[in-house]
Amino acid sequence: MSIPKTFSQVSRRSISLVRPTATTLVPTEAELKTATQTNAEELFDDDDAKKPISTTKFQVLGQPATMASLIVPPSIPLYVRRGCLVSLHGAEKLSMNYEWVHFWSNLIHYRSIKPSIYHKLVSTSKFNALVAPNFLSNRIGPWLGLSSSPFRTLCLLNLNGSADWNVWGQDSVVAYENNSSLSVQPPNPFLIRLRSQAFSSKYQTVQGRGNVLLSGSGSVYTVDLKDAKDEIIIRSEHLLAVSGANRREITNAITEQKLSPPPEMTRKVPSEAGRFFESIRELDGRLFWDSSKAVGIKFWNWTRRIYSRLINGPTKYLKIQGPRTLLIQSSYNVYLPASPINRNSVEQQWAKPDSLAQNPSKNYFNYASVSTNGNVEFEATPNFNETVKKIEESGNKKR
C-alpha cells in the first residue's frame, strides 16, 4: 500500500522527554496567578488553530510532563485511554464512544479489562484535546501494603517507519492516532507460549508512521546503544520501551543476566522458625514471644512478595544488545511491596518512654523466699539449680 505524501514531512524519529524538577512541583504564588488567567483557547497557538492540518500534532506540556496537547485533523480517529481525557476544544461535530481494544489479549496478560477501554474520538473538523495519565489505582494493593509509583509522566513517540517499538506495561500507551499506516498490536498470547522469552510478554508493538503518547513511572530517559558491541544491563521494572527492526529482532536482543550472590551470602544461618520451635522445647516465654513476632513479620512480608510476584512476575536483570534506543523510567512500572516490616521498626513503635525503660535482664525466672519470721525476699535466677542445692543441704542437716 502506498504511503501518502503527507507523511514525507516526517523525516526522523523524535522522542520528547522531560525531567521533573523540585521547583516545578510546588508552584509559586505568581505562577498560580498566571494559571488562573489562562483558558483553553490561550493554551493553544491561535495561528495553528486557524491553519488546516493533514497530520496529528502531539506536544507534551509542563515540567514534569503530566499533560499533553493533541491537535487532530478531521476524520482521523484518536484513541485515548479511559480516564485520561482532560478537555476538548474546537470540535464542532464530534463523535465519542467507548472502544474495546485488544480485549482478550489484555485480559489474558493483565487479568483486567481496564487496559482495553479507550475513548474513540472522530470529528468532521480539526479539534484540540488535553490528555493526562490519570489511571485508576489498584484497590487491593494498598490494603496489602503495596505501593505504586508516586507519579507518571508523558513522553512522545513519533514514528517514521524506520523502526518498531516494544512498549511494556498495561498503562504505558495513553493515546495514539488510528491512521492507516500506524499499528499498535500486542503479541499473540498462544504463540508466545510455544517459545521461551527472556522477558515478559506483556507488551505492545508499535510500528509504522504516526504519533503515540506514552506514560512512564517517574521520569523517562533515553539510552542509545550505538552498535552491536554496545550493551546495557537493566533491571526489568525500569524498562519502558525498546526499538528494533521488528518484534522478533527486539526479542532476540534481550537476554537475562544471572546475578549470583557472594559465597559468604550462601551460608546457612538459623532461621526464625528454628528459634520458634527451640523456644517451645525450652518453654522460654520471652524467647517464644520474640520468635513468634519475628515469624509473623516474615510471613506478612512473604505474603506481600508472593502477591507482587503473581501480578508483576519475577524481578530480572536484562542484558540488551545494540544498536537500538531504549526508554528508561526512574520509578517502577509495576506494583511492588513497600518497605518491608522489620523487627526494629516494630520494637520502636512499641518502645517504652526513657523514664520507664529498664535495662534488660539476663535472668528469666523470679522466685520468692519466705523466712520463719515472715519476711519475703524476691530473687531472679536463670535456673533453680542453686536453690535446689540449698534445699537439699538443709534437708541433710535436719537428718
Swiss-Prot record:
Give the UniProt keywords, A-Z: Mitochondrion, Transit peptide
Chain segment of the transit peptide: 1-22
Q: Which Pfam families match?
A: AIM24
**Compartmental location:** Mitochondrion
Any single GO BP term: inner mitochondrial membrane organization
Looking up Gene3D superfamilies in the UniProt record yields: Mitochondrial biogenesis AIM24
Task: Give GO cellular component annotations, separated by semicolons.
Answer: mitochondrial inner membrane
Recorded family membership: Belongs to the AIM24 family.
- The identity of this protein, by name, is Altered inheritance of mitochondria protein 24, mitochondrial
Annotated source species: Zygosaccharomyces rouxii (strain ATCC 2623 / CBS 732 / NBRC 1130 / NCYC 568 / NRRL Y-229)
